[in-house]
Amino acid sequence: MKNTILILFTAFIALLGFFGMSAEALADPKADPLAGPNPDADPEAINLKAIAALVKKLLG
């Protein structure tokens, strides 16, 4: 049961990261992808990305 919950949680975090990056790309399609995130493009997408990174860091 614990492994199932861990797998589902990891999949959820991965989807958050994927859709967060997609939303950021849609909000600012002409931005240089190597320049990093644009804080003016879509702050909510950047926050989801930051939350996903924090959870990944906490889980190891």
From Swiss-Prot:
Disulfide bonds: none
The UniProt record lists the keyword Oxidoreductase: no
Residues spanning the signal sequence: 1-27
Source species, domain of life: Eukaryota
One of the protein's GO biological processes: innate immune response
Subcellular location: Secreted
Reported tissue expression: Expressed by the venom gland.
CC per GO annotation: extracellular region
Propeptide part(s) removed at maturation, as residue ranges: 28-45
Keywords: Amidation, Antibiotic, Antimicrobial, Fungicide, Immunity, Innate immunity, Repeat, Secreted, Signal
Keyword check for Oxidoreductase: no
Modification Leucine amide occurs at: L59
AXPX repeat intervals: 27-30, 31-34, 35-38, 41-44
Family: Belongs to the MCD family. Mastoparan subfamily.
Protein function: The synthetic peptide shows antimicrobial activities against Gram-negative bacteria (but not against all strains tested), Gram-positive bacteria (all strains tested) and the fungi C.albicans and C.parapsilosis. Exhibits little hemolytic activity against washed human erythrocytes.
Protein name: Mastoparan-VT6
Organism: Vespa tropica (Greater banded hornet)
Species classification: Eukaryota, Metazoa, Ecdysozoa, Arthropoda, Hexapoda
